[in-house]
Amino acid sequence: MEAVHNTPMMKQYFSIKADYPDAFLFYRLGDFYELFFEDAKQVAHELELTLTAKNGKNAEHPIPMCGVPHHAANGYIEQLIERGYKVALCDQVEDPKLTKGLVKREVVQVITPGTLMSSLTEKENRYLVAVVEQDGRFGIARGDVSTGESALTSVATLDAVAKELSIILPREIVVTSSEHEAALSHLQIPLTQSTRRETHPHGDRAIDAAQADAFAVLYAYMHDTQKRSLAHLQPAIVYEAADFMQLEPNTVKNLELVRSARTGDKKGSLLGLLDVTGTAMGGRMLKRWLEKPLLSQHTIAERLDAVEELLAHYFERQQLKDTLREVYDLERLVAKVGYGTASARDLVQLKSTLRLIPRIQAALEELFSDRLGQLALGLDPHDELTDLLDRAFVEAPPISTKDGGMIRTGFDPALDELLVASKDGKTWLATLEASERQATGIKTLKIGYNRVFGYYIEVSRANAKLLPEGRYERKQTLANAERYVTPELKEKEALILGAEEKSITLEYELFCQVRDQVKTHIESLQRVSRRIAELDVLVALAETAERHDYVRPVTLTGRNVMIENGRHPVIETVLPRGEYVANGINLNEDREMLLITGPNMSGKSTYMRQFALIALLHQIGSFVPASRAELPIFDQIFTRIGAADDLVSGQSTFMVEMVETQEALTRATDRSLILLDEIGRGTSTYDGMALAQAIVEHIAEHVGAKTLFSTHYHELTVLEDSMPRLANVHVRAVEQDGRVVFLHEVRDGKADQSYGIHVARLADLPDALIARAEVLLSEFEQTEERTVVSPKEPVVQAEPVDQLSLFAETDPVRETVQTLDLINMTPLEALNTLYRLQAEARK
């Protein structure tokens, strides 16, 4: 190995890198972060950087190297993190000016997908999750380093873990075993193995062993990667699945709660519609409310009361809206204080937010709901802290905390003296520049400064000859200029720079002292942040209710449902006002299941989603899009809507249908809501119809959940005669001039026809094809009649030849063909065998 590999610096590099084998080591050298060896090769490839060699490309053993400027490193690091990598940030931890020999370096932070603090989406959390198995349960601990929020739960199976994580959508998962890593790899979220534990207070609520262990792993990983105090980490919220309405991941997706299924964006989702929050923390809280609807009738009523009160008081609501728009992201500002990265600008923003609290309280004085009153009482304006921040900092401090200019005059007498000395020195420099110009006659003469040479007098090379000899000492020659110093300038430079350096050092010390004082208020500031966030969400729900003419739903203790003129909250907003066709729904003990028929594109799926979204809005404490609504509290919502292959796990549309249906059939209770759309379309006609009927019967007899079941098997509508709690409804369509017109009205009774060929005509299929389809349809209707048997009677059916059933009997002809030895068979034997098979097939 070449000597360069054994230099003190490279030895230091190897020693540090050995502790972080799974991360790219960004090694600080002067104004750059450098990477070496395989790190350099991979990062150069990922970020399209120039790959060089530290000891020259022509060396016998060149050391691959690439680097990025330290002031621009965040952008490069973010790119690597978003691609699932980790970065270990290795900085100089002592002043090179005061060090002889090698500067001490150490890793000051490990940045991972779950702990990235920069480039944060304003209204989204960036969760890190730990999963641990203990005493037969799986503990799930989640935390957001950027906000300090943390929460704990536990579930019984790894499948339940995967479902919970599919709702949380963490950026990184920490597991303690390779078995768990393999089991969760299908989520396609970066996974890290770590077994170190570190205890941390988790709040007052009792937790089980799995939750405690998961939180210990989470905290240890946060501490190991961030390498600093995590004083802002809030006591964990402990919750159980039974505390909230359960939503399957596919339900969140099918109902487009937080993302549009078409674009993957927030716009076009229910969250995109509701989120008119004025604050970042309010937006994040609203998303959490949508993902965890309530089961507590008391809490639902509290929220509805607050929304109703805000809706009734327009001027107070507008005052709150206007004020909330001025509120900074208090949750993340406080987290930065605890994390030790808050700047003076951050502290001024914190002060500005606290100063808004009296305005918020004044608006709330006119509102009398219990929850709004509780929120108002918890809004502590922190007057003493606000006064401290006001006295300490100028209104617009610089971004950097290391260059001065932050502290207000009058805050510290010693600093004021240094600033006066520095200011007087700069006044003296301006006077000197003017007198030197006059003495030399050089109008372009100027006084400048750089870190290497200090203060200097600069003149152009052409004017250098005009300077009198003896007094000016040449310091630096440039292409077009000469730089000089004089005895007076040297003498004053020491005084000026001494005052500047001391003032900057003192400013930073004062800043740190103030920040530490703010740190003692973290817990109370976080309480204020949570209350402002909740108020913001309630104001947003009231604003949405007014904009779109929502009504307050009535919460029922029973299981009946009555909605008049219900509307899909998102779809109605993309149509011209008044064009959305509203529909009602009525379910009770004698009418628990609706069998929905109607043409494709008529609105069956929209009707089903509309009901689910109204139910969900009710359980987050929101008004709903209807003219009247009476709703029970649903414990779960299951959906099987839309055709989608699961390409990752290799499942067909039909298998996805069956898996999602199985979830509903096995987990739903009589307090659940089930939406099943076109079950059976992924297999043959008779298989599909048989399964659809069997599923309807099973739900009615064994589950008892309120169910909307849409189908293209019109034969199933006869079940209404034998199943007393099932009712037929249909989405109306009429035929005009040979074309179908969708009315989107839901009426009792079955649909008279499917209009499939009419829909094909709307899609502009060729006229000849449409004509042929009409002829074939007529023939099929004359030659085949499908029937449905009464529940529990045996089904005798023939299987169509165009598609094999999943449940087909053994085929002897097929078995014979599979066992033929074609390689050793003579042509005559092959012909005789084919003849026998043909005869067998014709039987």
From Swiss-Prot:
HAMAP family: MutS (MF_00096). It holds the Pfam family MutS_I. The lineage of its organism: Bacteria, Bacillati, Bacillota, Bacilli, Bacillales. It comes from Exiguobacterium sibiricum (strain DSM 17290 / CCUG 55495 / CIP 109462 / JCM 13490 / 255-15). This is DNA mismatch repair protein MutS. One of its GO terms (molecular function) is ATP-dependent DNA damage sensor activity. GO terms for cellular component: cytosol. One of its GO terms (biological process) is mismatch repair. The keyword ATP-binding applies. Keywords: ATP-binding, DNA damage, DNA repair, DNA-binding, Nucleotide-binding. ATP binds at G598, P599, N600, M601, S602, G603, K604, S605. This protein is involved in the repair of mismatches in DNA. It is possible that it carries out the mismatch recognition step. This protein has a weak ATPase activity. Gene3D superfamilies: 1.10.1420.10, DNA repair protein MutS, domain I, MutS, connector domain, P-loop containing nucleotide triphosphate hydrolases. InterPro entries: DNA_mismatch_repair_MutS, DNA_mismatch_repair_MutS-lik_N, DNA_mismatch_repair_MutS/MSH, DNA_mismatch_repair_MutS_C, DNA_mismatch_repair_MutS_clamp, DNA_mismatch_repair_MutS_core, DNA_mismatch_repair_MutS_N, DNA_mismatch_repair_MutS_sf. Belongs to the DNA mismatch repair MutS family.
